[in-house]
Amino acid sequence: NAIPGQHYRWPGAKVPYVIDSSLQSNTGFIQRAFQNYALGFYHEQNRSDRDDYLIIYVDNVQKGMEFNFAKLAPSQNILYTTFDYGSIMIYGNDAFSRDGSPM
């Protein structure tokens, strides 16, 4: 373990996460998204085959946010399913937009 002392570790090996009460209606969504990140899932728009399903207007992406749309190489992701437009692992069509118009 990389943590040097027992007193620095979380009690019972559990890390508490508190979701703000204003987000309570989104608790299930947040938990599923966190689980997907923990399992190593990538966002749908990063899939190696995403250009078969999406058009991303890179010129309309906020400066510094382009990395959110980096396409993976085929060797970086194994695609067991078709592209899922309804996935919780896909950003909305105006996420990181410079002017609020769809990406």
Curated annotation (Swiss-Prot):
Active against casein. Has a role as a digestive enzyme. It holds the Pfam family Astacin. Gene3D superfamilies: Collagenase (Catalytic Domain). Its cofactor is Zn(2+). It comes from Argiope aurantia (Black-and-yellow garden spider). Keywords: Hydrolase, Metal-binding, Metalloprotease, Protease, Zinc. InterPro entries: MetalloPept_cat_dom_sf, Peptidase_M12A. One of its GO terms (biological process) is proteolysis. This is Astacin-like peptidase p16.
